[in-house]
Design a protein with these regions (language model features):
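Phosphate-binding beta-alpha-beta segment of Rossmann-like dinucleotide-binding domains, i.e.
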Residues: 86, 94-148
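N-terminal glycine-/charge-rich "phosphate-binding" loop or analogous flexible N-terminal tail
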Residues: 1-44
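Short beta->alpha connector loops at strand-helix junctions that form conserved
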Residues: 30, 71-72, 88-99
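Rossmann-fold NAD(P)-binding glycine/threonine-rich loop
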Residues: 76-86
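Rossmann-like dinucleotide/phosphate-binding beta-alpha-beta segment
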Residues: 19, 135-165
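A short, aliphatic-rich alpha-helical micro-motif
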Residues: 40-41, 59-62, 144
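Rossmann-fold NAD(P) dinucleotide-binding segment
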Residues: 53-65, 80
Length: 165
């Protein structure tokens, strides 16, 4: 059976890991410091991580490692060039958060465009009630109609943002 090590289980919250645990000799750690990585992975054939860094020197010191599963979309925590050089397969979970991230992007963009945080503070802080003015001109009030905006990057998330917009 494959020796599987999950270095940062905390990152998945209360997700049920029982299907993964059935695939081999499984050991999971809530968190793993950079000083603990090598010791915890020394016999692993499969390493699962989310944020834990797996740099060149670490990968070179793990002769049994065959596969790294990144429990995230980003892959910048693993030295991909060295992994490829060593024949270690690496896979992320591309696409799992595309809709959520695109929706959050639109939410934040609209909030910035409409000065939501500023006006929220202005009203809740009592400034509006304390003034005799009907209108407040401290920040611009913009309309979406007729506005144009651009999307920087047309990967899966960028395309979804453009589609939703």
């Amino acid at each position: 059976m494959a020796k599987i090590v999950f270095l940062d289980e905390y990152s998945l919250g209360d997700m049920d890991l029982s299907p993964i645990k059935k695939l081999g000799e499984y050991v999971g750690y809530d968190r793993t410091s950079k000083e603990q990585v090598l010791e915890r992975c020394k016999e692993a054939e499969i390493v699962i991580c989310n944020k834990t860094l797996l740099r060149a020197e670490t990968l070179r010191a793990l002769p049994n490692l065959r596969f790294i599963a990144i429990a995230a979309t980003g892959m910048n925590n693993v030295d991909l060039e060295v992994a490829a050089e060593l024949g270690i397969g690496v896979k992320n979970v591309a696409g799992y958060s595309t809709s959520s991230v695109a929706e959050a992007t639109l939410t934040f963009a609209l909030s910035l465009f409409k000065n939501t945080a500023y006006f929220d503070h202005y009203f809740k802080g009592g400034a509006y009630a304390a003034t005799e003015d009907i209108f407040h001109f401290g920040r611009p009030v913009r309309q979406l109609r007729g506005s144009k905006w651009g999307v920087v990057g047309m990967g899966s998330i960028g395309r979804e943002v453009a589609r939703l917009a």
